[in-house]
Curated annotation (Swiss-Prot):
Residues 78-197 are annotated as: 10 X 12 AA tandem repeat of G-G-Y-[SG]-G-Y-[GS]-Y-G-Y-P-[AT]. It is found in: Membrane. It is a multi-pass membrane protein. Residues 1-19 form the signal peptide. Binds chitin and may serve as a framework constituent participating in shell formation. Inhibits aragonite precipitation and may regulate aragonite growth during shell layer formation. Does not affect calcite crystallization. This is Prisilkin-39. GO terms for biological process: biomineral tissue development. Expression is confined to the prism and organic layers of the shell with no expression detected in the nacreous shell layer. Also expressed in the mantle edge, extrapallial fluid, hemolymph and, to a lesser extent, in the viscus (at protein level). In the mantle, localizes to inner epithelial cells of the outer fold and the outer epithelial cells of the middle fold at the bottom of the periostracal groove. The chain crosses the membrane at residues 26-48, 58-80. It comes from the Eukaryota. It comes from Pinctada fucata (Akoya pearl oyster). One of its GO terms (molecular function) is chitin binding.
Amino acid sequence: MKGFLTLLLVCAILSTGYCQSRRRAALTGLVAGATIGALASGGLGAGAGGFGVGGFPVGVGAVGIPVAVGGGIPYGYGGYSGYGYGYPAGGYGGYSYGYPTGGYGGYSYGYPTGGYGGYSYGYPTGGYGGYSYGYPTGGYSGYSYGYPTGGYSGYSYGYPTGGYSGYSYGYPTGGYSGYSYGYPTGGYSGYSYGYPTGGYSGYSYPTGGYSGYSYSSTPGYGYYGSGSGMGGMRSGYSYYSSPAPSYYSSGSMTPGYGYYSSGSGIGGGMGSGYSYYSSPAPSYYSSSVSPGYGYYGSGSGMRGYGYYSSSTPMYYGSRSTGYGPFSSGLGGMGSGYSYYSSSTPSYYSSGSMTPGYGYYGSTSYPGPGYGSYSYRTTSYQPSSYGYSSYGTTYPGHGHWHGHKDC
């Protein structure tokens, strides 16, 4: 009898408004939690860029750093997908011809919506979209022929609306725009033929700024400075931040010093490279080099593709080999396009070597035949002499230095 009365009491309590309200609150919390989780999976854009829903960051923050690099359209799930022709939804999507929605999407011909989208011909909406021919809306988008709306967009022929846009032929409205033929309205604009309204311009017609010299190179001095180099066939086109003086001697040098700086190199026909890099310390080199040291530095070459991180020294020739977790390399034509992180010094001797040292540093280079081009990130590599490759010496100073083989 006592058990029956207890059961009746429990049922009575459950039928009260108190318990119903508790259940409603629990349900509301569950829905809210799921919603927040979904938004978080898409990534939250930093600062003024707001947040991205499902991997669709629509802008970058106050410091231009999109943080949405995952989630998005659930066509498949992440991981390090190299040569993924399907629908990865996240992870390191290299050579993804489908619809990656996040992660490091390199050479994505589909519709990546986030992450480091390099050579994205589809519709990336965020992340580091390099060579994006579609409609990226945020992130570091280089060579964007579509309609990027934010991020570091280089060679944007569409309508980028913000971020670091280089070679923007459309209508970028803000950010660091170099070679902007459209109507950028702000930011550090170099070679702007349109109507930029402010910022440090390197070789820009409307405004001023700290311009460099030597074969149309425009090194910068200051936080989030920008520069471009077009010198000859072995020149480099670069964007970079430099809160400290940059030094170089000849060619299209693009040294950088700063946090989240970027740089690109396009020179020597097919023997060129396009890279972004960060350098919080002075860089010293001699000819067509783009060394970097940074947090999330990136680089792109013209041949091969690979991502890898390394915590031990690397010794290799003109291949993009790696040592460590998630390492991949593509030999092919004896070249490699590689991103990697390395926490220990790397050494090399000749060819297209791309050693690195740093946190999420990156490097790129095309293989021999078309020239060797290497970017690297180093955080501790003291050298008073430097390296000699192909008869060219690349001196180092202090902790940082890099080189490009032409």
